[in-house]
Amino acid sequence: RMVKKNMTSELKVFGTDGVRGKVGEHPMTVDFVSRLAGAAASVLAPQGGTVVVGKDTRISGYMFESALEAALVASGLDVMLLGPFPTPGISFTTKDCNANFGVIISASHNSYEYNGLKILNSLGEKIDKRIEIDIENQLSKDPITHTADTLGRATRNPDARGNYMNFISGIFTQPQPLRKIKVVVDCSHGAAYKIAPRMLSALGADVIPIGCSPNGYNINLNCGSTNIETIAKTVPALSADLGIALDGDADRVFLIGPEGNIIEGDQILYMLASIATNNHQFNSKIVGTILTNSGLEKSLKNKGIQLYRSEVGDKNVLQLMRQTDSILGGENSGHIINLDHSPSGDGLLTALLVMKAIVELDTSIGELLHGLELVPQFNYNIETDLTKLSNDLITELSDEANTNLHNGRVLVRKSGTEPMLRITVESLDEVHAQKLFESIKAQVN
């Protein structure tokens, strides 16, 4: 027997990367998250089934995990709880366990005051816009709740961590392949704080872990890929060969060279593309975004590799990768996707693929970066009410700035996760770039 409840509608909650906000404010309240879970259950598993739920280490994750568990079980679904787990690992487990869908509780690189939800389909990929619209429309309908005899049940999966680690380490064929490498890994006090050091140690590396002591409040605080200065100093100070800087949910990565040089997403893409040219099956196509450095595009062209550009966001990158039949894609923020292995950006896997090349090709970071010449890129943010800025005005601002910039380019865009207007300027002249930004800021204000 089904029991119905009344509910009001609240739409437009999905942003560029799922649902995100300040904890305690719409949409990140227990009440709304519970309702969203019920709506997702109706759309993605109307006949019942299993849902995988994982989270990062922020304090509010426990609260939202409980809310999701209750709402999904009340919707007649079995729930597999992973606890703190890297986003790409939740993606892998969702597909590996044949779940109907997965839910990631994380605000990625944001501080502990924020949290969010990312919903995955049965393949472990982020749901597309059509499904998001269906879920939002479902919010305005009466949810169906179950009586005791048709409720789901919640369990924890003790094998998930080992299965994910085996999957990642499967890129190597030899035991202890990294035994000659000394590596610093910064887990941002986030979701990979157990898995990353264990994985690297199991592969034979000499591991120095930092940012691996989460307390619920220190995720992304002065550490990880968003605050890279700490590990950039640590690597040369300890004479390490490499540094790996993950973000809070471990779906993105920056690397640090032995001299403390920071290697961002565009550089990692170049290295992986260069490595792929040794593979006769590589079709010489990769996907970046509108923000990808034009110097990378030119350097890849010199190697006979074509770069396609999507809108910002790893979901858009993946979509264009499918359309162009590209294996490799990513963003300068460190989201790197390799479809030979996973449809999710995976920081640890990306780092291991670079380390595998260093070991097996007997090469170095410097040699892998040879031939890459990036154009200086300057990024600015203007905090503003985005609802008052029309898309036409943003296009006008961008066109005007590009007219005033010779030998470079300007991008003006709305942030999908924060009330910010983001401006990117590529120019050899930093003073001119700053002037352009000040001009745009004055017009916005």
Locate predicted features.
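Phosphate-binding and adjacent anionic-ligand microenvironments
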Residues: 242, 278, 282-445
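N-terminal small/polar loop signature for handling phosphorylated ligands or for N-terminal nucleophile
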Residues: 38, 42, 50-115, 198-256
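Short glycine-rich phosphate-binding loop at a beta-alpha junction
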Residues: 48-56, 80, 182-184, 284-290, ...
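Gly/Ser/Thr-enriched, mixed-charge loops and adjacent short helices
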Residues: 3-10, 22, 115-238
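Gly/Ser/Thr-rich loops at beta-strand to alpha-helix junctions
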Residues: 57-62, 110-111, 188-193, 250-251, ...
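Proline/glycine-rich low-complexity loops and linkers
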Residues: 89, 133-166, 170, 257-332, ...
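Buried hydrophobic positions in well-ordered alpha/beta secondary-structure cores of metabolic enzymes
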Residues: 17, 53, 90, 103, ...
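An N-terminal, well-structured beta->alpha segment
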Residues: 2-75, 101, 154-183
